[in-house]
Amino acid sequence: MERLLVLARHGQSEWNLKKLFTGWRDPELTELGIDEARRAGRWLKSQGTQFDVAFTSNLRRAQNTCALILEEMGQAGLETIRNEALNERDYGDLSGLNKDDARERWGDAQVHEWRRSYDVPPPGGESLKDTAARVLPYYIQTILPRVMSGERVLVAAHGNSLRALVMVLDGMTTKTIASLEIATGIPLVYRLKADTTVESKTVLDKDIDQDN
């Protein structure tokens, strides 16, 4: 039985390009972000991948990435379930601020702690621990059972909601997760064992040009 789980962070958004804290704000994808999503779909198709169901967040950048991936794979219209449990972490008072401006206001060390620590939230926002507290129950109760039943599952979401999942899948600690970056538009392909642990993991090489 194939137990396939593919995680994909959305393509570059307009606020990624401007280096703004985004969180639950809802900017569109850039042209590069659209290209990243399409490229991910082409790569997955080239690997012979097909999906039975897709999950995404309530935010457009993830929803559009999901749709573009599926379109490139010839699976437009696939069952796609949206849920705010998969939303990006809420950056609270940092939302909409330029990251360099935030460093000038609060200092490099404080902003780094808010961005990379496991359990220190920015003012009015969520820590990675808080994000995991909504992502992981949704994964365990809703997504994982479908993977374990043999369905091939795509999850198109966000850097921090996916970091929470990767932390569990890869057995990372609250310290090692601090250094993990999930690139935009790069699929993480997991195959799971019968006990729900990881059998294999494949990551698209971001330097591969799928048009050549």
Curated annotation (Swiss-Prot):
InterPro entries: His_Pase_superF_clade-1 (IPR013078), His_PPase_superfam (IPR029033), PG/BPGM_mutase_AS (IPR001345), Phosphogly_mut1 (IPR005952)
One record GO biological process: glycolytic process
S-S pairs: none
Job description of the protein: Catalyzes the interconversion of 2-phosphoglycerate and 3-phosphoglycerate.
Name of the featured protein: 2,3-bisphosphoglycerate-dependent phosphoglycerate mutase
EC number: 5.4.2.11
Catalytic class of the enzyme: isomerase
